[in-house]
């Protein structure tokens, strides 16, 4: 899972995560086999750290979101991305969450299954007709719903779903009935840990799995994150909410690539891209640039146009500009504007160089503005 990132600047997060949680995260990412990763205590930690490595690399390019959302565990990544949680708190909460869910899975054994090709309301009918402990756990996309509960309950609801017209019912290799009342003990255990982390208010809202609404007040997340464990993930509704808020471009960060397909199925005309490895960063830069438009902004009756772009530092260190790059120089996507130490400063945008903001020899910090561009 993590091998492509070895040697990349963002790999430093792996060492930080190991120090925080007292586990060898590098070994988990590089040496753990598929069977061991089925253990939710391993899967959640490795997925979270992997996603944060991708996020860190993307932030070094100066690319920032308007909204964030994450599916299940991914909600912790989204909250860390917006600054609601620090990286330290994110790691600690993910470890606590995984352990709580593992224990709940032992005390209340259960399973999950994906129901394909059946409307949401019919899947809900199937769960009710099963007359057993089974519920909808994930509303992923149109015709893609996950159910969870007791082994007998999931089997019974799956059979009813097929009778109602489901194209396929696929058992999932999981260690519990997540996002159902079977996780009540985990929910109660996690609530205090989240409150103790004191999530912060954020400028960038996060769309909650529980209610599919945008939230940026830190004090709301103790109840939302804990409730998420025993409530269905309303992912389809989160996507619809973002679309209604004007989002047209969706970037999936981290291993898997599954959410990109869900966005395409749910939002007509959505632009999507998935980024999981360093090799895909250049592709992301090109994708972002292809979607750049001059967006009119209403300011006191006048139309201004959002064409200004800042290129930021990918790392801390001493800045050295490219010698022949001057004001008025035409910049393409990926053009090298200079170096910060050994790290190249590449422009994620096309445009015309207006000025360098950092001067030669200046010691800069990560994400400090380096240059100012005006988009073509």
Could you tell me what each predicted segment is?
Residues 296-355:
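Acidic, low-complexity mobile loops and tails
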Residues 271-294:
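Short, flexible loop segments at boundaries between secondary-structure elements
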Residues 18-23, 33, 82-230:
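Alpha/beta catalytic cores of group-transfer enzymes, especially the acyltransferase/condensing modules
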Residues 59, 162, 240-246:
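Non-catalytic positions within long, well-ordered alpha-helices that form the structural scaffold/packing
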Residues 74, 326-339, 360-370:
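Short, well-structured beta-strand-loop connectors
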Residues 138, 321-323, 339, 355, ...:
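A residue-level detector for short acidic-glycine micro-motifs
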Residues 1-123, 168, 172, 249-278:
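FabD-like malonyl-/acyl-CoA
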